[in-house]
Amino acid sequence: MGKWEGTGNQTLGLVSQSGRFRLRWQTRPEPGHDAAGGRFKLTVHSGVSGRPLQEVTDQRGPGEGAYNVEDDPRPFNLMVYSEGLVWTIVADEVVMARPATR
């Protein structure tokens, strides 16, 4: 679905055909900033109405994590709020497999 890297606040758009996707993120200190400082907040918003749907993380300092989003198929916006950190976000569509029937 997508991969983004950056610093500071950004709005990232994506479209999920299933409404199910996994977000993975990693943050590290920006050059010249305190290695233990910084803040990273990631929320998922509707790309249609703009309303917030889910808060993914609100972390202090560098780190990483993953979060599964389950919603209706639609456009989404990822809202990034970041201070003092370089971030990378990867979004992958989740495909649900069903056992074969005989």
Residue ranges of predicted features:
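Acidic, Ser/Thr/Pro
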Residues: 1-102
